[in-house]
Amino acid sequence: MPLIRIRGLHRVFGEGAARAHVLRGIDLDIHAGEFVAIVGTSGSGKSTLMNILGLLDRPSAGSYHLAGKDVARLSRDARAGLRNRLFGFVFQQYNLIPTLTALENVELPASHAGAAREARRARAAALLRSLGLGHRLTARPLQMSGGQQQRVSIARALMNGGAVILADEPTGALDAESGRQVMRLLSDLAGRGHTVILITHDTDIAARAGRVIRVGEGRIAGDSGTRAAGPAVPVLPETTGSRSAFLHALREAARSALAAIGASPVRTALTLSGIVIGVASVVAMLAIGRGAQEEFVKRASAIGTNWVVVGSDQDTRMPRRPLTLDDAMALKGLPNVAGVMPGRWEQATVRAGAFSIDTDIIGTDRDFRGVHGWDVVRGSFFSEADERGGSPVLLLGSTVAGTLFPDGRDPTGEFVFVNMSPFLVGGVLESKGLSENGSDRDKVVAMPLRSLESRVYGPGELSVIVVALQDMARLDESNALLREAMIRRHGTEDFWLADAAGAFAAAEADRASQNLLLGAVATISIFVGGIGVMNIMFITVRERTREIGIRSATGAAMRDILVQFLTEATVLSALGGLAGLALAVGIGAVAALGLGMPVVFSVTVALGALAGATAMGAAFGLVPAIRAARLSPVEALASP
């Protein structure tokens, strides 16, 4: 039984007036191990016949049996599998991928077959050495002569066994000596059992074959007849798809993608700018925002979080009663109240010797310590007797103490002047750092309320009443009781209530709004970057159309081409995402070390931004990848 049997083969291109009937009723048998030359002038149909024989194209009509199997109507991927296992192509223009080395070009068929990298690399190197190219393994096509490139092409054709070698004008682009070397190689392969089908217009070249078939006007014009052939080369066994094979293909696609991306670094960088900026902005800004939020919570928590502030409404259009010490005493008896601190805030100049400072003065009582958790680190708190008698005693905040006593000595027992009134320093308050709005909490002086009223400013209304709660889970209940108690005392709601939980909630709402805005900006930027990826992938497909044809000819299925270019888009986007993360870390470092801003990165946000950028790139790379996968192998090989 012949290896190749063709009956009534026709190939028609175009429709209507553009219709071209290239092959007309071809009948042909070729046995395994034959060396056949198909010779004809330009336009005779010989190249179209070769494309159909090599399963690069399908006939319009007729039958084609290969090793007893009808292959005329096979799917594209099924034909690719047969090409990979059975055929090896040697082209006039060599058709080597310029970005790959000689070794990598030869490996292509085995790579598409799913062969292990080490095994295929060893076989490719052995083939190149057998063809006298052992010293050119790492050379790229443009670094080699035409004869060397054609020998690389022959080695590639033999990579998976090359049971059938299809050579299309293999000497057409070579000098005479290189052409003779190539023909000797093909004759040697035929002698070793390979079925060699040579396509040529040169009758002298054709005469080197054991059988000459002449083609003219799409028909067989002459056939010297079948010659006896030796034992045929076995065909590479068919492999079935598996998860490991798919992962192998994915790894190879990723490796090829990195090589392709590295070939145009400037274009790659420009393409990725949108993704880089989008990822960097969202990760860095959210890190800065989260750092600011945590710093806010830390600062606010320094004076406790279990309090409610009662303040007087300052709307002068409405009648109101001032907050008084009696109001504070009345609130102490309410359920869930742990302490009540009356507070009157004023401004004063405090002096000690040659040093002075303008600072806040708080008139309060001993509940100041319990409500805000604000104790002394030196000396002692003022006593109940100090409160009742309005004693000239006060406590210095650490900033005030450091300003008035810069030599670092303990100011306890020293005298200072508040405006013009002398006071004894009873102690120094522990440091509470900055407030949530950035002011210095330690720039403060605390004294008994009666001392403030009798010795510095005279009688006046309270600024606020701060109520500490025992259980913050009952906050709503306590707020309602405080409101009722104050309305009973004042006859109207001429006051306001504020609590730490509300302040935290407002800050969190602001942060959420900022995050939403940042997310929107980053999404738009990444979206624009995705469009850039799509654009560059369309350009890449157009620039590498011949490469797609070469990969198809060496056995790449549509899925392989799709995975190749989709992986390239995905890797491209992932690199942009990683670059964005690196830029975000740089921005965060500048903010933290250079500007002193709190920065807290989130692994979840970073991974989410990276995944989003990668997914966006993959989505935008899908259409170009599909276009690449659907390219006709014949048309792709014919591209410039």
Curated annotation (Swiss-Prot):
A Gene Ontology term for the protein's cellular component: plasma membrane
Pfam families listed in its UniProt record: ABC_tran, FtsX, MacB_PCD
SUPFAM superfamilies recorded: P-loop containing nucleoside triphosphate hydrolases
Location of the ABC transporter domain: 4-242
Protein name per Swiss-Prot or TrEMBL: Macrolide export ATP-binding/permease protein MacB 3
Subunit structure comment from the entry: Homodimer.
InterPro entries in alphabetical order: AAA+_ATPase (IPR003593), ABC3_permease_C (IPR003838), ABC_transporter-like_ATP-bd (IPR003439), ABC_transporter-like_CS (IPR017871), ABC_transpr_LolD-like (IPR015854), MacB-like_ATP-bd (IPR017911), MacB_PCD (IPR025857), P-loop_NTPase (IPR027417)
CDD domains for this protein: ABC_MJ0796_LolCDE_FtsE
Transmembrane segments: 269-289, 519-539, 560-580, 581-601, 606-626
Places the protein is found: Cell inner membrane
Residues annotated to bind ATP: G40, T41, S42, G43, S44, G45, K46, S47
Enzyme class: translocase
Topological type in the membrane: Multi-pass membrane protein
Enzyme Commission number(s) from the entry: 7.6.2.-
Similarity comment: Belongs to the ABC transporter superfamily. Macrolide exporter (TC 3.A.1.122) family.
GO biological process: response to antibiotic
Statement: the UniProt record of this protein carries the keyword Transport: yes
Key word rRNA processing present: no
GO molecular function, one term: ATP binding
